Amino acid sequence: MKEKKISVIEMPLDFGASRHGSDMGPSAIRLAGLGNKLEDLGYDIVKYDCPIQINPKEYEDFGNPKAKFLEPIKKSCITLAEEVEQAVDNDVFPLVLGGDHSIALGSIAGISAYAKKNNKRLGILYVDAHGDFNTDETSPTGNIHGECLAASCGYGLPDLTNLYFEGTKVNPKNICYVGTRDLDNGERELMKKAGVTVFSMSDIERHGFAAILKKVIVFFKSHADIVHVSFDMDVLDPMFAPGTVIPLPAGLTNREALLLMEEMADTNLVKSAEIVEVNPVLDVRNQTAILAVSLIARLLGEKIY
């Protein structure tokens, strides 16, 4: 039996969001028992650390109002990309703990570098209430956590689109969203132009989660050789995950999210993952972080029976 190896990469970065607190997300997830859960699942934890250091002075000036805190985000995400690429090169599963969703710039760049040199089609499962498909021209806030996926597809500031290596990181036609329910006008138009696939909460209400889940699995089996899962806890209804950066009503239930992770695990396509925007400042008895651990476990092969 092949040994299962995992590298847990903590990214306590919240420069990409207007509401701070997600920098404490990795600690909350660790305290919720992630290490023990991974060992119970038979994983060899080859690394569990934080590769970045945040200087408090970096909070004093956000710089470009169209892409706030661009420089510290770039620096951190380049480091993350290196960590992710190194892990997959060594047949180690990189699990990234955010932090806000701007860290996806680094995660996706790292797994993309691996995919390109191994001639693999990279797919992205983007489980998020939001599109994160703004650019510096369309963003109403200038917060980079709302621009990260567009940049990974080649849209936006060159500082972001060319992060880690020059050029597009993922074909937008290989991206599938689940649980979307809040899009800005500009990003909606860009998403349509780019050709991403979106299964919104309206689709889930209209057709039922089971039917949508089947479509998600079919999508990745036909569009990808490897998949990166990018899971933002705000996709969940605040009833189940109150401790997120931007809680929105009418989201996924915990059961739906857990089943999605379990079904993705069964595809044997998932090569890397991140879970982001756990905000302990807004949480209740750490329940959001506890649920994050359960979601990670299902994605990594945990079964009820």
Where are these regions (language model features)?
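Catalytic cores of soluble, metal-dependent hydrolases
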Residues: K2-L13, R19-L95, S107, Y114-K117, ...
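Short, glycine/polar-rich helix-capping loops at beta-to-alpha or helix-loop-helix junctions
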Residues: D182-K193
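Short active-site oxyanion
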Residues: V92-P94, P172-C176
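Internal, well-ordered alpha-helical segments in soluble enzyme and binding-protein domains
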Residues: A129, F133, H145-C148, N171, ...
